[in-house]
């Protein structure tokens, strides 16, 4: 057994000797050095490409946001590209070009061409989009990322470096579906409250313009005494098709996600709820929104079929709403935070309502899809 152990130890020592010989041969031939040079220099290229991509993404989203908000300033691309560059290039990056389409106009150098191999294909005609391409730039103005070791290898004496490129594409526009709260407002009331999309109030915490004091949107008014809408009559138990109703609550959290809207016959639809009692989860959502002055996003319907839990709403678009008060009976009511009055009176009448005002803004991209009617809300998404 002792001889066996000795032989095994001797074998291990012999293996180490063999490995040492192989390493010496490879080093003598420059193979290991070449491999190390390749790893270091390729790693630099990957790092530069990642930084350029981050800069292009950030710039595309920032420009898209500025365009959605009305200013459309492509010149901000450079600051975002530089902010994502590291010491590898001296904290700088080059914006090769900015192009795109904004409604009837263009962004940057104009509509993007179709032959840029670094960028995604152009979106369909009629889409608002911007493309930002970034590339290597050093603090000294050079556009070549110099190698660390590669130039020392045989045959590479003239190699000066490489230029790395990255491209990003962002789109913006009205969302067709998205994540919303579990209430729905009518297109008629949206049209009246915003003068057909021409007048919006300031977003909280700023008070709205005096001309845009909170509107009261009735949900249930069997006496007709509180109705001040010019919208046509609607489902049983509701004042008008232009007013407010509960949606179905498939997630039991007073929310609808993009997947809760059904696309049929060229339109999106979603289910309704009787609303005989205010759902407890909606009491929490609406209470928090009113207390914290949080903007809520609501589906706006253009038409409906059926009644109560069998009602189906046809989606017109998504809107942003600042909830300032509500009255669903003595168990769930709060005075409007601007007027100080309980909306839709009370005084024993069987009337329920919400109060607030419509806003312009950006809806979170999660769960949202582009292509809807513009009701003051837009979404921005990276698409390439």
PLM regions with names:
Residues 71-78, 82, 91-384:
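N-linked glycosylation sequons
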Residues 1-82:
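Alpha-helical assembly-interface signal, strongest on the long, hydrophobic N-terminal helix that forms
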């Amino acid at each position: 057994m002792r001889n066996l152990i000795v032989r095994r130890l001797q074998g291990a020592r012999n293996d180490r000797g063999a490995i040492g010989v192989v390493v010496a041969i490879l080093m003598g031939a420059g193979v290991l050095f070449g491999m190390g040079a390749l790893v270091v220099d390729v790693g630099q290229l990957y790092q530069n490409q990642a930084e350029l991509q981050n800069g292009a993404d950030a710039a595309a989203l920032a420009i898209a946001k500025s365009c959605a908000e009305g200013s459309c300033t492509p010149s901000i691309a450079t600051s975002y590209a530089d902010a994502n560059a590291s010491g590898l290039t001296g904290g700088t990056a080059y914006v090769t070009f900015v192009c795109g389409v904004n409604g009837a106009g263009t962004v940057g150098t104009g509509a993007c061409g179709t032959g840029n191999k670094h960028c995604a294909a152009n979106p369909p005609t009629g889409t608002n989009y911007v493309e930002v391409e970034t590339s290597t730039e050093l603090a000294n103005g050079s556009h070549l990322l110099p190698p660390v070791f590669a130039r020392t290898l045989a045959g590479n004496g003239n190699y000066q470096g490489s230029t790395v490129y990255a491209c990003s594409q962002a789109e913006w526009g009205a969302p067709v579906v998205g994540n919303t709260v579990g209430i729905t407002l009518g297109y008629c009331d949206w049209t009246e409250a915003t003068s057909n999309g021409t007048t919006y109030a300031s977003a909280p915490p700023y008070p709205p313009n005096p001309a845009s004091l909170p509107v009261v949107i009735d949900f249930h008014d069997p006496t007709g005494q509180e109705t001040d809408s010019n919208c046509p009559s609607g489902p049983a138990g509701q004042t008008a098709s232009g007013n407010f109703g509960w949606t179905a609550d498939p997630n039991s959290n007073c929310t609808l996600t993009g997947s809760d809207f059904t696309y049929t016959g060229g339109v999106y639809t979603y289910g309704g709820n009787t609303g005989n009692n205010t759902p407890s989860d909606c009491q929490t959502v609406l209470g928090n929104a009113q207390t914290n002055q949080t903007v809520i996003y609501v589906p706006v319907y253009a038409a409906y079929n059926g009644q109560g839990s069998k009602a189906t709403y046809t989606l017109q678009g998504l809107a942003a709403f600042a909830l300032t008060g509500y009255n669903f009976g003595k168990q769930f009511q709060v005075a409007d935070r601007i007027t100080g009055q309980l909306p839709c009176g009370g005084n024993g009448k069987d009337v329920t309502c919400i109060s607030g005002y419509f806003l312009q803004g950006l809806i979170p991209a999660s769960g949202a899809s582009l292509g809807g009617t513009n009701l003051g809300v837009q979404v921005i998404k990276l698409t390439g």
